[in-house]
Amino acid sequence: MIRVTALSNARLALAFIDYMKTQGVDMELRPQGRYAELWLAQDEKLAQVESALEAFLLDPQHPRYQAASWRTGSLHYRGETGAGLRGWLPALRQQAGPLTLGVTALCVLVFFLMALIGDDRVMAALLYPAGPAQYGQIWRWVSHAFLHFSLLHLLFNVVWWWYLAGLTERYRGRASLAILFVLSAVVSGMVQSHFSGIFFGGLSGVVYALMGYVWWHGEKNPGGPLFMPLGVIVFALLWLIAGYFNILGIAIANAAHVAGLVTGLLMAFWQTRRGQSHGYQR
């Protein structure tokens, strides 16, 4: 057994142990006074553990480590850190950059404007272009993403946006997030309008683009900061299936979801092919 390090915060020590377990490394926590010592039985994996520990100490609240605790069933860690709403919200607040916050604020503002002055007036200004006469109104190609038609619709999209866009802005930069937002809004709008006309709205096409983008980067760089928990991937796929088979009994912009997902995957694929998969910001 090798003593790797000692941490003064036992909760963080457990989180790191959970994460290393998902990487195929078994570690042991030994209380030592006010400290929690981390011990490793597999000598040959010491370099891997030290590298992972360095990244962990830079950002111990990253959702990757909480996701690892969920996957390994570490109830002790979840209970002490106040998982769920109390555990996630501080991490979400930390990672939201200016663009993430700005889009969130615009979505909320537009929603309240619709309630105050009426849906028709707001939609008339922000809907996808109805034809060539409106093609020059450039904002319409993306402004449909800010329209939400119920509180549940708004909350669903904004929470996912906050989480995924926050990760992307923090680790891939504001420019990457801005490009992905514009591309996915335009492409998902074009595809959805082909199937259902212009009366649609919501951030979900962009959200699905972010899901594809983050997932691809996580697959290509497993040790990097961008990561999609398996539960989120399963949920996204089930939501797509439910929409196509009308299981939920509500109107869902299925074409926009698929178009957004493909856009995000393609942008991540392009970046990783150009050798940008490790170009993370800190």
Swiss-Prot record:
In terms of superkingdom, the source organism counts as: Bacteria
The UniProt entry annotates the active site at S204 (nucleophile), H257
Question: What's its EC?
Answer: 3.4.21.105
Gene Ontology biological process terms in this record: proteolysis
- Enzymatic reactions: Cleaves type-1 transmembrane domains using a catalytic dyad composed of serine and histidine that are contributed by different transmembrane domains
Give the record's GO CC terms: plasma membrane
If you read the UniProt record, what top EC class would you report for this enzyme, in one word? Answer: hydrolase
Q: Which Pfam families match?
A: Rhomboid, Rhomboid_N
The GO terms this record gives for MF are: serine-type endopeptidase activity
Coiled coil region boundaries: none
Instruction: List the membrane topology term(s).
Output: Multi-pass membrane protein
Record has Protein transport as a keyword: no
Which InterPro entries does UniProt cross-reference here?
A: GlpG_N_sf (IPR038236), Peptidase_S54_GlpG_N (IPR022732), Peptidase_S54_rhomboid_dom (IPR022764), Rhomboid-like_sf (IPR035952), Rhomboid_protease_GlpG (IPR023662), Rhomboid_protease_S54 (IPR050925)
What keywords would UniProt list here? Cell inner membrane, Cell membrane, Hydrolase, Membrane, Protease, Serine protease, Transmembrane, Transmembrane helix
Tell me which HAMAP family the record gives: Rhomboid_GlpG (MF_01594)
Q: Which family does it belong to?
A: Belongs to the peptidase S54 family.
Kindly give the PANTHER family that the UniProt entry links to this protein.
PRESENILIN-ASSOCIATED RHOMBOID-LIKE PROTEIN, MITOCHONDRIAL (PTHR43731:SF14), RHOMBOID PROTEASE (PTHR43731)
User: What is the protein name given in its UniProt record?
Assistant: Rhomboid protease GlpG
Classification from the root reads: Bacteria, Pseudomonadati, Pseudomonadota, Gammaproteobacteria, Enterobacterales
